């Protein structure tokens, strides 16, 4: 009986912890305007970690340039913002638009594969 309770508790805990990597934003996440997004990321670096453990970094230049990097990978291009989205084009990866939300000072972006990634902007 105790092992069943432990197993159920563990499964529920893991489901809660994995919620950020699901395809839906949490209800507390705030949709941002283009102006808010621009103010947050212009001239800044956003660092995050994909669900598979890959550390990623994006540098949003004040001139609209974008540099994206991960271990053994780098790409460059341009970025722009729309209400609730960061969009752009990278030389290797091509065009993209990621839904963007804010929560507790962190930036959350939904990748093309649906994964939601938490970024710290510095």
Where are these predicted regions, by residue range?
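Lipid interaction determinants
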Residues: 2, 8, 17-122
